Amino acid sequence: MNTKNSNEARKYTEKDKWGYVVCFGTVLIFIAGIGHVNSFGLIYKDFIVDTHSSAKSLTTAHGVFSIMLAIGGLTLNVITKRCSLRLGGLIGAVIMSTGSFVTVFISSTNQLPFTFGVLQGVGFGMIVPVCYSTFNHYFVRKRTQVMSLIKATQGTILIFYPQLLKVLLSRYGFRSTLLLISGISLHTFPGVVAMNMSTKTNKNRTANVLTIENGTNNQETADLIDKHKDKKESQIDVATKNIKLSIFKRDVLEMLNVKILKDPVFCNICIGQSFVNFSDLIFFVLQPMLFYQYGLSTNQVAACISISAGADVAGRFGLAFISSIASINTRLLFYVATILTLAARIVILQVRQFIWLAVVTSFLGVLRAWLHVASPLVISHHVTHEDFTGAYAVFMLSTGLVNIIFSPIIGLIKDVYQDYIPAFYALTACCLPCLFLWPAEYYLKYKLNK
């Protein structure tokens, strides 16, 4: 008996130890995969000028990347019915690394929607669910605490990423820097290899559903084949195809969680958050370009990006501390952070001195952390635990659609006016759907309940 307990204790100890390897792999994947994304303006500024490219291609690339993340996740869901989760992640790493390497040879930013948006988007979209699924397998009680530590570690490393890119660009040039970034992306492979779960992979769920639905009819089908093999064979084939087709349709509907779209509150949450998250992403991608237009040097722009990353980390730690001593309404937090973000962006479009730009950027970094932390929690608090994965996939698709539709419009505004400021006002206005639709929802609920 004691030997059995000792073996079980050793088993769980080894599982806990490997769980921290999974944490390291998760940090490695996010840094290697998308660590450079916030520094796009720093990387491509001179390239856009030299090739006479448009800013629309840069924003479109991020729009495509956003929707391809969701498609990559759905693709992984299909692949893992026939192979292991880790193998699906490795396929994603191959696709993402290929996209990163091909980017080295682009002749204009018009190729970025494919090399970065499609290839890297689908690849990274296949890797992320592998990370979170493996993480959830190893951590249950300490999940929030450990995930906060992972995100804080990522943020701390990202503080120094713009400075590293600035050095690489000055010493090795544009193409060599892209080649080094593609080399860094190869670190996603050891990160995915670390995603090892001790449990065996489930068998093909489609086959199981087919067996369950036809369980009572299996013997009858066999009898029909034996008695009327020649006459009924074609009918059985047609029936089998119809059953498989109906199961496929149901799998697609389950995968997309279409039933959640019947919930108007969830749809309102999706619309509001999709516009805010789109606005946040494109704002920080184009922010270095705006600062260059203001006349800041490369050192000052890199410093602002690092300050924003540091403020993001501080915001996460601060929110973790506040939530440990007081209960926080995550939807209210998201709404208040959106209001403050709108105000701070208007301010940053009025000032030109480096010190004030750095101060407002740090404030925006804190608000960005609050938005990112609250975003999935708003959804998880509204839907059941069983529906969360499907609901979040629908939200990712919603965000991707907003990105792919409105990203080119933002880039077009900049190209038409030959000025980044009108484009940033348009990005700021993207906060308004959330700020107007959410209070309208509360007003209608209050009026109906009165």
Regions of interest found by a model, annotated:
Residues 1-15, 190-271:
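Long, low-complexity inter-transmembrane loops of multi-pass membrane transporters
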Residues 31, 99, 111-126, 151, ...:
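Hydrophobic core of transmembrane alpha-helices in multi-pass small-molecule transporters
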Residues 36, 40-47, 262-320, 372, ...:
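Extracytoplasmic gate region of multi-pass secondary transporters
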Residues 47, 117, 124-139, 146-147, ...:
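Intracellular juxtamembrane helix-capping segments at the cytosolic ends
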Residues 72-85, 315-329, 414-415:
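Helix-to-loop junctions at the C-terminal end of transmembrane segments
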Residues 142, 149, 153-205:
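Helix-loop-helix hairpin linking two adjacent transmembrane segments in secondary transporters
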Residues 279, 294-300, 317-319, 323-378, ...:
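C-terminal transmembrane helical hairpin of 12-TM major facilitator-type secondary transporters
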